[in-house]
Amino acid sequence: MSNAPARSPSPVLTGVFAGPIAGLKYQTPTLSGVTSATGEFQYRADEAITFLVGGIVLGAVKAAPRLNLAQLAKRVDGKLDKLLDPSVTNLARFVHTLDQEGDIESGVTIAPIVHELIGDTPINFSPPVMPMGQGGGGDFADDPTLRQILDRLNATPGVFTARTPRTLCSAAASRNELRRNIRGIVKMTDVRIPLRDGSYVCADVFRPAAPGRYPVVMSKGFYGKSFYHDCICNEADVLRKEEMEDRYFSGNPDGAQYENHETVDTSVWVPEGYVCIRVDARGVCKSPGLQAPFSVQEAEDYYDAIEWAGTQPWSNGNVGLWGMSYLAMAQHNVASLQPPHLKAMIAQGTDSDIYNEALYGGGIFGAGFWNWWWKIWSGNNHCGERRETDWMARALATPFNDPTAYGPNGSIFMRPDMSKATAPVWIVGPQVGAIIHQLGSSETYIRSTAAKARKFDFADAWFPDSYSNKSIAEHMRYFDYWLKGIDNGVMDEPPVRVQVRTGNGAHFVLHENDWPIARTQYRRWYFDARPSGWQNDGRRPNMLRIGETMPTEPARAEYDAHLDLGTPTLAPAGSNDGTPRWSTGISFVSEPMSEDLVLAGYMKVGLWVESTSSDMDVFVSLRVLDEQDREIRYESVVLPVDPVHIHPVGHGLLKVSRRKLDVERSTEYWPVHTHLEEDCAPLRSGEIVPIEVGLNPSTALVRKGCRLLVDIQPYAPAGVPVRAYDKSYHVDAVNRIYTGPQHPSYLQLPIIP
């Protein structure tokens, strides 16, 4: 007999089965039981633990504080990249099907009677390993034993309380839930956020599974918060979206850019200790009410959502906003209302004066973009009949910059009072725009002087780069600073970064303290409406001149204002045929550059113009030709707007009757027009008038030997979405441009020494 003292058992520890999964049987060498309502089980250190349903062994694994179903399949061992393995897919589908309510996002609860009903029924989750290319052993849903089990469970009252008769959970849904379990993510779908008027908006909340209080990253949008885009309105939509999500995380054969349009990827952010919330605006998908984009009510709803998120038990009280395009623009509106829990924003591709920067830029309605956006891009953002205000009709009926329609309390679009937008903001501005965001991002940064801190990136491939590993790391550092209180030096860096494009997608970066860049030199090239003699590309005859010396002789060039618009389409390009848009108007070309020029900032032209009609639309494009007289493509991402043609380096427009300048807002580098009805000045016969046209801020390295090419046209140029076309002053009209000492028409460029 041994005299050694008996070893006392090690302490009992508690673990959690992810989901959570409640009612699951477990056994260790010393303990046994059923997982609790929160998925808890007990074990001792270094023990293996076996999980069962009835007498069916699901698998055994070393006990740990947190376990999930993917760890029970030996071939998978919890690895995210192996979830297509049928052994884990079938196992997860079986367990998920047993949930009483049939809502696995809320966890799985297995009724006690299930174990008795299933008993020791043998079931094979893992088909035999087959030689490569010979399949995986058939569909688990066709397994006769599984069918018998489901028939038995469906016939017994109390096993299932909803979604009856129960069918096998889809493979895609089970894998999607497994991914969240592995990453430690809990998803809550269609959470109702109460609003001040007694209504609500629906949100999807993704939070860390581990207990705690976390900062919130919120987006409130117009496109639908379901996976990738649009709504989930019925069971067919549920299955379709589960399949899309599963394919995205299984190699992404569809080429999806993100989990949800213009919001953060929850699979990246939640594991780093953030709650991510996607909110559907009023009238979108299952949020009741009328759709009213960029309205005061929408901003107030956003305020209420922020305050709700900041006071939830899983929130640390700090809410940040992250979004692109629409989801960026909405941020400035709500920031001007100053919700107390809003602590920082990242707005990428934005506008805060929608009339001037997106809707009626230059006084001409952006028909190509807005019709496409409303009918196509946001056309499936509702369940049933679309519920909306008549904002589009009212916008078309209000072509002037009426502050009652487009001001801080605008009845159509809200223009936020930026002096009240005090939350720290990081703005990412694109250098290529579909009539929106290019000017607006830059102007919004300049107007954000009330913000506690501000940063600005002027970028080329802003949209795809927002989801790059580099951008995610930088944005997370920013929110770590403002939402978690981590002093990581992110705000000690120069606040402005400018990507200077060099052609074919390449660029270099300027790190600056100011935007526009303080050392900018504004140089002028003067138009000369005499033939240049340049042997051009053959597309347009009679190229005219532009140079840094004022021409000594007066000259005039004219062109037809009328063109054939062709067959209209809802695409931003506007039509499939008709007059080629590159062929209209007149063009000015420079001599080869004698030195490299770095362009970065705002551009403008000053023109002396006349028309045989009462008005004229002036579209100006700056392009660059290389030493072989080929146009240089500076953008790194070809826009879907007009993929055949190159987006110009600089682009601007003006309806000439809107030429009156707002002298208080205009600067040396950028003309601002009043667009007030009382300032509208139609042209009189024979009248020659001066105008200034701003070209959206941009960048380019123009190398020695390259030429500048400036197109002046009566309609939207190639590579840019179309605008409204008013036949009343285009048909049979002739437009004229004057140059020379009495009419010094010019191009002004921002040169960085």
Where do the protein language model's features map onto the residues?
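Non-cytosolic beta-sheet module surface loops
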Residues: 18, 41-43, 195, 609-613
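Active-site-proximal cap/loop segments of hydrolase catalytic domains
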Residues: 183-491, 495
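Surface-exposed loop/turn positions
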Residues: 47, 199, 274, 319, ...
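Short polybasic amphipathic segments
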Residues: 23-27, 48-51, 370, 376-379, ...
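Residue-level signal for short segments within beta-strands and strand-turn junctions
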Residues: 28-30, 53, 195, 207, ...
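Feature for extracytoplasmic/surface-facing segments of secreted or surface-associated proteins
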Residues: 2-182
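C-terminal, loop-rich substrate-recognition/catalytic regions characterized by aromatic stacking residues
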Residues: 461-753
